Amino acid sequence: MAAATASLSSTLLAPCSSKQPQPQQQHQHQQLKCKSFSGLRPLKLNISSNNSSSSLSMSSARRSMTCRAELSPSLVISLSTGLSLFLGRFVFFNFQRENMAKQVPEQNGMSHFEAGDTRAKEYVSLLKSNDPVGFNIVDVLAWGSIGHIVAYYILATASNGYDPSFF
């Protein structure tokens, strides 16, 4: 029993195999010859040789009538990250810098460094960049992580059948 369970579980996780099954497992392997996954849901692919022509015509008719869009994860993550980096650099950059300037600590209208605190000096070489407006590595990491979060949200909601229907 343990050997049958082990071979069945390896069959479920492995791609289609052309090995001949043992005689006592012949019935199980005819039903589950190939197993594919759509997200976390298993898809059973039954391959039967006795009525292949009727099943092919039926499956081709079904395939032609349904249109299913699946999202490519790498494409979604790349586009979402690129879009968020673009928005961070060209749209929200000035707004972000103005809000950061308002939050700098001050004493008597001067920054702590200008008031004489030498340890309050920023570590400048980390934030240096060759970008004309000063988009640095911290901005890239922040906006890139926002893009990844949005992409994973899109992929998670699309894989479980969630349809927001905004319009």
UniProtKB/Swiss-Prot annotation:
Annotated localization: Plastid, Chloroplast thylakoid membrane
Entry keyword annotation includes Membrane: yes
Chain segment of the transit peptide: 1-69
Keywords, alphabetical: Chloroplast, Membrane, Photosynthesis, Photosystem I, Plastid, Thylakoid, Transit peptide, Transmembrane, Transmembrane helix
Biological process terms in GO annotation: photosynthesis
Pfam families named among the record's database cross-references: PSI_PSAK
Region (Disordered): 1-32
Gene3D superfamilies xrefs: Chlorophyll a-b binding protein like
Residue stretches of biased makeup (Low complexity): 1-31
Keyword Plastid attributed: yes
Predominant subcellular localization, coarse grouping: plastid
GO CC annotation terms, alphabetical: chloroplast thylakoid membrane; photosystem I
Protein's recorded name: Photosystem I reaction center subunit V, chloroplastic
Species: Spinacia oleracea (Spinach)
Gene: PSAG
